[in-house]
From Swiss-Prot:
The keyword Cytoplasm applies. It is found in: Membrane; Mitochondrion; Cytoplasm. The gene is FAM210A. This is Protein FAM210A. May play a role in the structure and strength of both muscle and bone.
Amino acid sequence: MQRSVLHTASQLAHGMCLLFPRTGAFRGLKGPSVSSNVGCKVILALDPPKRCLHAGAALFASKSSAVSSQPADTPRKVPEEREPLTSATEVPKQSPVESDASDPDPLQDKSISLVQRFKKTFKQYGKVMIPVHLVTSTVWFGSFYYAAMKGVNVVPFLELIGLPDSIVDILKNSQSGNALTAYALYKIATPARYTVTLGGTSITVKYLRKNGYMSTPPPVKEYLQDRMEETKDKITEKMEETKDKITEKMEETKDKITEKIQETKDKVSFKKIKD
């Protein structure tokens, strides 16, 4: 009797395990639903009730661990809106025309360096500065060469001003002698040469303006604009001349065609009258 009761209970438990392996058991648990693929395998043996109880415990443990392993929903962070940066191109810039118009005369501008004054003066007064520079450079080099010919020893002076020993040794042991010494002094005196050239250019420009040989030069930008306008005017004149010639040719051709048509009409009307 006891064995039959146990056998019946084992069959009922075995049926319950077969019914609930792939369904969502333990639906009372809070949280997201667990995948339905989790199940249990039932092995038929001599003692099925114990196997079914072990399978049910394993199913419960797997579902509870899956529920606890899932993190809680965290609120999403909304990205903060950044203000657009102002581009560097929005900074107002001074137009080149205004900068050119505000440039002072390089001969009178003392705020820039000597080399910059020399370059700007060359750009603006090149026709006057080149002859002045050639004359002053010839005088400088000739004076140094004459001093070297007269036996002036410049080596102690070069050592005194701190010239490199390599250059001083070349001057001491040089075969050319006077020419090389004069050239070395010529290069050393570059600041003085530039100053004399600028002064000579300024005096020459004032003299030429005073006697009416030279007018005040316009800025480079205005000069280029004038040259472009002259070129534009010449091109416009050429185009107008070409247009006039083409118009004359077209009128001549039109007159000839009109004459031919008129002659043809006269011939046709004459034939009709004759007939």
